[in-house]
From Swiss-Prot:
Function: Involved in pre-rRNA and tRNA processing. Utilizes the methyl donor S-adenosyl-L-methionine to catalyze the site-specific 2'-hydroxyl methylation of ribose moieties in rRNA and tRNA. Site specificity is provided by a guide RNA that base pairs with the substrate. Methylation occurs at a characteristic distance from the sequence involved in base pairing with the guide RNA.
SUPFAM superfamilies: S-adenosyl-L-methionine-dependent methyltransferases
Source species: Pyrobaculum arsenaticum (strain DSM 13514 / JCM 11321 / PZ6)
Annotated binding of S-adenosyl-L-methionine, by residue: 91-92, 110-111, 137-138, 157-160
Family affiliation: Belongs to the methyltransferase superfamily. Fibrillarin family.
Protein name per the record: Fibrillarin-like rRNA/tRNA 2'-O-methyltransferase
UniProt-listed Enzyme Commission number(s): 2.1.1.-
GO molecular function: histone H2AQ104 methyltransferase activity; RNA binding; rRNA methyltransferase activity
GO biological process, one term: box C/D sno(s)RNA 3'-end processing
Subunit structure: Interacts with nop5. Component of box C/D small ribonucleoprotein (sRNP) particles that contain rpl7ae, FlpA and nop5, plus a guide RNA.
SMART domains with a match to the protein in the record: Fibrillarin
UniProt keyword list: Methyltransferase, RNA-binding, rRNA processing, Transferase, tRNA processing
Length: 235
């Protein structure tokens, strides 16, 4: 038996994010579905006030986890152009697609051909025209530079060592002046022997050395262990 929705309201801080309240008192975040009637990863669809919303699961999306954990700055709005490195099968990009809308654009880079096919099936083939899929290796931005114009945000979520370096290298190519970077640090992908806090410091220092001001850092527990989200901007 499904739990009835009693209210949907805009999130107090984040554009394009909504808070859904259920009759049992629980609340979940959601985005307004750009392609009504279609799911991407089995998420709950919620109808309210003539609109359809997609529940945004923090156990499936690190950006959702950061928002639920109190992230204050999400530099994504309607019309934002973004480079997303490590698009995987499209869970988080799909919600960003909802937020940026038809005027926005998400260049989505994924390395694995198998996962890339899933991304195509779940997002592009279902009519999300603001998503540009790119099969490529985020370590080598010159390989896909001809596909991408300047972007407002570079976001990275890859299971690679040197995550901050990869992010900064891509930002050097594509980030507009005044733009933001969003770094998901996966500590265990960098050094399984070091404490996660030390790995976080190491990656943050890399961004600082590349000229970035760190605006915010949020840890993602309990949704993801040994993960953190960092928001930064070029000085």
């Amino acid at each position: 038996m499904s739990i009835e929705v009693v209210d949907v309201r805009p999130h107090e801080r984040h554009y394009g994010v909504y808070v859904v309240r259920f009759e049992d008192g629980t609340e979940r975040i959601a985005t307004k579905n750009l392609t009504p009637g279609k799911r991407v990863y089995g998420e709950r669809l919620i109808k309210w006030g003539g609109d359809e919303y997609r529940e945004w699961n923090p156990y499936r999306s690190k950006l959702a986890a950061a928002i639920v954990n109190g992230l204050k700055l999400v530099p994504i709005r309607e019309g934002t152009h973004m480079l997303y490195l490590g698009a995987a099968s499209g869970t988080t990009p799909s919600h960003i697609s909802d937020i940026v809308g038809e005027k926005g654009l998400i260049y989505s880079v994924e390395f694995s051909p198998r996962v890339f096919r899933e991304f195509m099936e779940k997002l592009v083939d279902q009519g999300r025209r603001n998503v540009v899929p790119i099969l490529g290796d985020a370590r080598f931005p010159y390989q896909y530079a001809h596909y991408i114009k300047g972007v407002d945000v570079v976001y990275i979520d890859v299971a690679q060592p040197a995550q901050a370096k990869i992010l900064a290298d891509n930002a050097d190519y594509f980030l507009k002046p005044g733009g933001y970077v969003m770094l998901v640090i996966k500590a265990m992908s960098i050094d399984v022997t070091a404490p996660a806090t030390e790995t976080f410091k190491q990656e943050i220092n890399t961004l600082k050395e590349r000229g970035y001001e760190i605006l915010e850092t949020v840890h993602l527990e309990p949704y993801d262990t040994a993960h953190a989200m960092v928001i930064a901007r070029k000085k």
